[in-house]
């Protein structure tokens, strides 16, 4: 049994055929999923998908490109989302120096 630890099942092209996406993944031996939120809105979408699928879990975070936009209320929202049992990880997070959209020091902070 494999787990896809980084998917975005809320993307419109995937979500509109979610049953088919999951079926094709199952055929390849992928039976669990962590749907990664890149901001609060997408994290909530990930969480809502978990309501109907016991094998889908969610994560919450901020994409490194948007690190410059993090506020105290954003951090509070992250903590609130982590209260849900199906929210199992923090991520999308990391350091992205390739595109350099957010200052590296802000990403580290």
What residue ranges belong to the model's regions?
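Mid-domain alpha/beta scaffold segments of enzyme catalytic cores
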Residues: 1-109
